[in-house]
Amino acid sequence: ILNVLYNNVLQINPNNFSSTDRNRYVHSKGHTVEALYTVLCDQNFFSKKDLNSLNKFNSHFIGHPTRKVPGIEHNTGALGHGLSVAVGMAIGFKLDNKPYKVYTLLGDGELSEGSIWESLLSASKYNLDNLVIIIDRNGLQITGKTEEVNPIEPLLDKFQSFGLCVKQVNGNSVSELDEVFKEIPFENN
């Protein structure tokens, strides 16, 4: 998912990262930040040598996203807050009449957090067609399987009930991801 986003979709790189005129990416699924570090390294935000300090004392490369790492948009880690930040960014773009999009990756385990559902209410109210929410539906969270800990199905129906356009693809398929991202903005049927 991250490779497709950074290589084919976001158009974010070290040369334009400090610009306000660009798309945004919020990594809400903070515990998978190592995957994001790898992609950011491949995009030349920092060197592979920098990654040698991962999770070491005084390192900026810790177990959750921090803005101290080049290419990280927002600190995340507390479950469910990334979507709230992404919604706020998307509203800001709308208010400023900016054409940019905000993409955010959520883990299905964090869908148990109330702030997710509050954010969806706002996304629906403000018709945020510039917000792309990606859910990694792997069925797991820290204490077990999502459907055993706190069931979230029928997930598609829940998101559609907010008036959101929902697409389901295989997140391991580059071609499916490429295709669905090319369809943005989606037509809400």
Predicted segments, located by residue:
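Cofactor-binding active-site loop characterized by glycine-rich and histidine/acidic residues
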Residues: 2-125
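Thiamine diphosphate
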Residues: 56-68, 89-91, 95-100, 120-189
